[in-house]
Amino acid sequence: MRNINPTDTMAWQALVQHKAEHLSIPQLFAENEDRFATYNLSFEDQILVDYSKNAINQKTLTLLRQLAKECDVDGARQAMFSGEKINRTENRAVLHIALRNRANKAIFVDGKDVMPAVNAVLAKMKAFSEKVIKGDWKGYTGKAITDVINIGIGGSDLGPYMVTEALRPYKNHLNMHFVSNVDGTHIAEVLRKVNPETTLVLVASKTFTTQETMTNAFSAREWLLADAKDQSAVAKHFVALSTNSETVAKFGIDTENMFEFWDWVGGRYSLWSAIGLSIVLSIGFANFEQLLEGAYAMDKHFYHTADEQNIPLTLALVSIWNNNFLGAQTEAILPYDQYLHRFAAYFQQGNMESNGKYIGRDGKAVNYQTGPIIWGEPGTNGQHAFYQLIHQGTTLIPCDFIAPAQTHNPLSDHHNKLLSNFFAQTEALAFGKSKAQVELEFTQQGKSLDEVKDIVPFKVFTGNKPTNSILLKKVTPYSLGALIAMYEHKIFVQGVLFNIYSFDQWGVELGKQLANRILPELEDDQPVVSHDSSTNGLINQFKAWRE
């Protein structure tokens, strides 16, 4: 990947000048009544992306696409898909796309085709999951498995949890549970719900040394052995998603039940790998394959589709415009589908851990904003929580609204009411409500302007708030796979344009190092004086109060 500061490009300088035109969303619609036709993109018969409610015109898009060319997005894309080690700080390839390479085309890393290993793990996941789902896998008392606990953190938890929740309409009889937090409350509450005789535990840690994951795994093992009283029971109730066979075996897990993945799979892109075993156990391997198929279809779209019709590229460019030129520092992801209630949290990690960097690929601090803050909640809950600030606050918050046209639960008129809010919110954010409209409403209610003049300003909505509307035909394994891959590739493009390395996460390391230093200091009651006064004071108060 080339090292190109985006602010040095001709396109960036032209965009700075273009910003001074102060484009207005209502005005853009007034100038082109059929604006939607020009500013929407479709993916197969599955996803419609309407980006017309952004403050952009054809000049904006032309300049943004020129920025992508000057920053060599195409070259970076080819480098990723061909297995080049674009994660330079860790000297690794970035090949989550290989995990869903349904054409089985050879992809090489260090001269070795990775696809035979990928296919072998998939075959192993299929065979294992079918055994558990059919009831042929027995616990230590000979009973079939009824509950599965996935113990992981970060990508080993967020992705599988998000997908299993999103695809609950496709789940089988197995009950899925997810434990991530090292807070003992998390594992304790889950263990209270399950029977050790019929519970299978997946321990998801590449190194099998992750502090939070292994702390929870050892607690789960103690819980099992308190009931089984036989070390051999561990092998019947635990499997590993790991590459550290020696440590896995020491834990008591049969290495035949160890599912590997590779250093070219980043944690936040790992749900497509063995880390997705909990997904397979929840919805079955055939549905997991459809998830892979959907992602693969989006991979092909991203790789082959021209810039003008390329959905991930377009979304990334619009985001760059909103954040780097219009001054937004955040983006909200707002799914109008309860099954997608963890989607925003998943891409909070996906985006912020990827692009929350201040050092460019040249090793120097950047002089522009990089990754935005990502957050969100399902609609319509958010409307009664934080939409007030989006509509009338002083911070510009671009929003992605996501909704399915078809629901899995057609109860009464629930879905029409839900979607009426989905459509209304983007209209309200784009066009707002003027002072004249507010005054007219009061007049129609029989009130004089004199008696309402003091309240009128509070009911004005300025509008001109940018949104994307992402309409799915239905949330299925296939469409969800495509949707996830769409956001993955958007994040990739943004990282290329930001001139940063999107696939490392050094920012998580310092806190872990300091925690490892502090942990031994908590083992006695001696006052701590080795830190700054604030940290010393907090530790010493903790010691005074703990039981």
From Swiss-Prot:
CDD domains: SIS_PGI_1, SIS_PGI_2. Its main location: cytoplasm. The active site is at E353 (proton donor), H384, K512. GO terms for biological process: gluconeogenesis; glucose 6-phosphate metabolic process; glycolytic process. Its EC number is 5.3.1.9. It is found in: Cytoplasm. It catalyses: alpha-D-glucose 6-phosphate = beta-D-fructose 6-phosphate. It is an enzyme of class 5 (isomerase). The lineage of its organism: Bacteria, Pseudomonadati, Pseudomonadota, Gammaproteobacteria, Pasteurellales. This is Glucose-6-phosphate isomerase. GO terms for molecular function: carbohydrate derivative binding; glucose-6-phosphate isomerase activity; monosaccharide binding. Catalyzes the reversible isomerization of glucose-6-phosphate to fructose-6-phosphate. Pathway: Carbohydrate biosynthesis; gluconeogenesis; Carbohydrate degradation; glycolysis; D-glyceraldehyde 3-phosphate and glycerone phosphate from D-glucose: step 2/4. GO terms for cellular component: cytosol. SUPFAM superfamilies: SIS domain (SSF53697). Belongs to the GPI family. Keywords: Cytoplasm, Gluconeogenesis, Glycolysis, Isomerase.
